[in-house]
C-alpha cells in the first residue's frame, strides 16, 4: 500500500486544514473557482460540481480539484497556484476527480472507521505500507493506526516525501516493498 485513506472524514479534515495553512495562495485559488455562496463547505461544493452533468460546471471543478490534489501530493511541487486559464479548457480533463468525487461523496462506501474496525480480518496476511512522511492527502496517522492494528503489516516511512510516486524515494520504496512481498509469499 502507498499511503492509506481509510478515514474519509479525517482525510478531508486534513486537506481542509493543510491547504490554507501550507498553501494559502492555492487555497484562495481553490475557493475562487466556487461561487461565493458555496465557499463555506468547499469540499462538498466541489463534489457537487464535479458530479454535475454539465461540462460547464464539472470541467473547471475537476481541473481545479485535480491540480490542487497534484500540488498537495508533492513534497516540493513546481507550482503552488492554479492556472486559472487552464481550468475552463476541455482538453485532457483528468478522470481521477470524477472517481474520487463519487467515492468520497459516498464516504468511500464505508461506515466511519470501517477500515480500522475491520483490520482484524487482515491478521495472518503480510503487508507493507509505504508512507510519505509529509503526505498531506493521506496523513501518516492513518497508516500508523492501521499498522498498529494489523500486526503482520510493516510501515515504511519515506522521509522527505509526500504522497506521489514521483517524490524522491517513494517509487523506490514501493518497488522494494513489492519485491520484498514477492519474496515473502513465494517461500
Q: What do these predicted ranges mean?
A:
Residues 140-153:
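Active-site-adjacent alpha-helix of alpha/beta-hydrolase-fold enzymes
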Residues 10-15, 169-170:
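Short aromatic-enriched loop/helix-cap "lid" or pocket-rim segments at secondary-structure transitions
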Residues 111, 136-142:
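Conserved alpha/beta-hydrolase "acid-adjacent" motif
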Residues 1-11:
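Active-site nucleophile loop of the alpha/beta-hydrolase fold
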